[in-house]
Amino acid sequence: MASSVGCRTLSVLFLLVLFITVHCTDTKPKKKKDIRDYNDADMARLLEEWEKDDDIEEGDLPEHKRSPPPIDFSKIDASKPEELLKMSKKGKTLMVFASVSGNPTEKETEEITGLWQGSLFNANYDVQRFVVGSNRVIFMLRDGSYAWEIKDFLVSQDRCEDVTVEGQVFPGKNAKKDAKGKEQNETKKKGDKKAANRANKGKQEL
């Protein structure tokens, strides 16, 4: 009888040891990848995991993931298409292009447009500035609905040749009045696309 009990006890102990051994083997943590060896895909997965675990506020989400603000059409004057454009760009990043007159150097453009940016800042407009040529600059807005107000300010400046908003060119105070204006505007539009790509890349690297 005692022998039978002893055998059962040994059997139970053996099964217990076997279970613990198998469990420890299955739950052994995998070797973690050194964060210094992470590539872009690893970082993207890590960011997704963080976003799943955290309740991210709407304002902290990337722009393409945010819900567009509702447009109240009752407040829009149908006779002014610009008003609809303003509402549709509310809360979205938008680029405003401007040209400085008088064939300036890039340094002169930097100084002149820096003064413009300072005036906009003092008027509580949040804009970033990127000089993209000897006489060309981009003003990047976090809220695109203010683009037309900024355009109105820029075209009133003495050294402003023209301003481009959403592909539409507005002549500035120092606009050129010649037959080549249309051709120059088409060239600017092509150059603006390249400049916008460079500015976006610079923004992402900041």
Swiss-Prot record:
Q: Which Pfam families match?
A: Mesd (PF10185)
Position of sequence motif Prevents secretion from ER: 203-206
Q: Where is this region: Disordered?
A: 171-206
Tell me which UniProt keywords the record has, alphabetically. Answer: Chaperone, Endoplasmic reticulum, Signal, Wnt signaling pathway
Q: Where in the cell is it found?
A: Endoplasmic reticulum
Q: What start and end residues bound the annotated signal peptide?
A: 1-24
- The record's principal subcellular location, in a coarse class, is endoplasmic reticulum
An annotated GO BP: protein folding
Q: Does the keyword Ribosomal protein apply?
A: no
Where does the record place the region Structured core?
Answer: 93-166
**Keyword Cell division part of the UniProt annotation:** no
Write out the biased-composition intervals (Basic and acidic residues).
175-195
The terms describing its cellular component in GO are: endoplasmic reticulum
The intrachain disulfides are none
User: PANTHER family from the entry?
Assistant: LRP CHAPERONE MESD, MESODERM DEVELOPMENT CANDIDATE 2
Question: Quaternary state and partners of this protein?
Answer: Monomer.
Q: What does this protein do?
A: Chaperone specifically assisting the folding of beta-propeller/EGF modules within the family of low-density lipoprotein receptors (LDLRs). Acts as a modulator of the Wnt pathway, since some LDLRs are coreceptors for the canonical Wnt pathway.
Spell out the family assignment given in the record's similarity comment.
Belongs to the MESD family.
Name of the protein described by the UniProt record = LRP chaperone MESD
| Encoding gene (name) | mesd
